[in-house]
Amino acid sequence: MTHPQKTPLYDIHKERGGKIIDFGGWYLPVQFTGIIDEVMTTRKEAGLFDVSHMGEIIVEGPKALEYLQKMVPNDVARLKPGKILYTPMCYENGGTVDDFLIYKMDENKFLLIVNAANTDKDFEWLQENNTEGVELKNLSDEYGQIAIQGPKAEKILQRLTDTPLKEIKFFNFKEDVDLDGVKALISRTGYTGENGFEIYIKAEETAKLWEKIEDAGENDGLKPIGLGARDVLRFEVCLPLYGNELSPEITPLEARLNPFVKLNKTEDFLGKDVLVNQKEQGLERVLVGFEMIDRGIPRTNYILMKDGQEIGFVSSGSQSPTLDKALGLGFIKPEHDQEGNEIEVKIRKKTAKAKIVKTPFYRRG
């Protein structure tokens, strides 16, 4: 039996009182001071996240762009060096292999940031379909990754560098930034809905940088944030979580990722026929947001009903600390997708009333 892997920050999390769990084969902190406190800290001050478990895959070669255009439904051709694209990646049947970010390093080199639990599966799928002869490298073990998110994130990080961070726009990145002696790639991205950055460094420099950022933010309320709060933060802004809102059985169109599926790009891509067919014939289910009217918290895989009939299931649900409401995401038959429409959630043996609401639930300022 293989033991979970440790990120370069494992010892620091233990020192800070992090409650460590096995998350998708990694030892990671689920919480430090408590989920509600950590969510509100990130929304109001700034939070520091260990995301070193995420996978890093390099795609390189003269045909790198041609290859990626085949592999993903988004249009990688419109990406310029220094910019980032979010995309799903599909199987031939339209189901989702993963969703990830693509960083364009230069004309023939791209960096993919993939979900931790999917890294090996993604790498195999990328290799299996590599008829273009591009070079594929899984460099996940060489990278550490730290995210700093929240209204004070930029102010705190700026204390460590002369590089003007305000010049790094949303979904842009800069390489070789000197953070108090640590060389880093910095992007203005995140999984919280707040302003902030994701920072890529050599694995062996991760702990040193983490402590430098902690010191820089100690008077601004910066705190370490665990996976529990990270999940609530992404849920409040309705960002999909692989395994919940995306899976091999769920297509990007069902998950409402239409802006990231370019059916009219000139290149064919894996899964295109199925997605075109779904768009033309209509979807059998669609992702919606809902708010509880009755007491109760919707949990993953609870059944959704209308007039006593099953119409779908919950993909994610939580009490929202930011909005002080019980909210859910779930897949339902499209005919029930009208804002304000009342549905029921089967919570244990009872049903509780809920209503369809607009997403995202929360938008920053």
Swiss-Prot record:
Alphabetical UniProt keywords: Aminotransferase, Transferase
Gene3D superfamilies xref list: Aminomethyltransferase beta-barrel domains, Aminomethyltransferase fragment, Probable tRNA modification gtpase trme, domain 1
Pfam families: GCV_T, GCV_T_C
Disulphide bond pairs: none
One record GO biological process: glycine decarboxylation via glycine cleavage system
Reactions listed under catalytic activity: N(6)-[(R)-S(8)-aminomethyldihydrolipoyl]-L-lysyl-[protein] + (6S)-5,6,7,8-tetrahydrofolate = N(6)-[(R)-dihydrolipoyl]-L-lysyl-[protein] + (6R)-5,10-methylene-5,6,7,8-tetrahydrofolate + NH4(+)
Record-linked InterPro entries: GCS_T, GCS_T_bac, GCST_C, GCV_T_N, GcvT/YgfZ/DmdA, GcvT/YgfZ_C, TrmE/GcvT_dom1
Top-rank EC class of the record's enzyme: transferase
CC terms in the record's Gene Ontology section: cytosol; glycine cleavage complex
GO molecular-function terms, A-Z: aminomethyltransferase activity; transaminase activity
EC number: 2.1.2.10
Role, per record: The glycine cleavage system catalyzes the degradation of glycine.
PANTHER family, per the entry: AMINOMETHYLTRANSFERASE, AMINOMETHYLTRANSFERASE, MITOCHONDRIAL
Family: Belongs to the GcvT family.
Subunit structure: The glycine cleavage system is composed of four proteins: P, T, L and H.
Protein name: Aminomethyltransferase
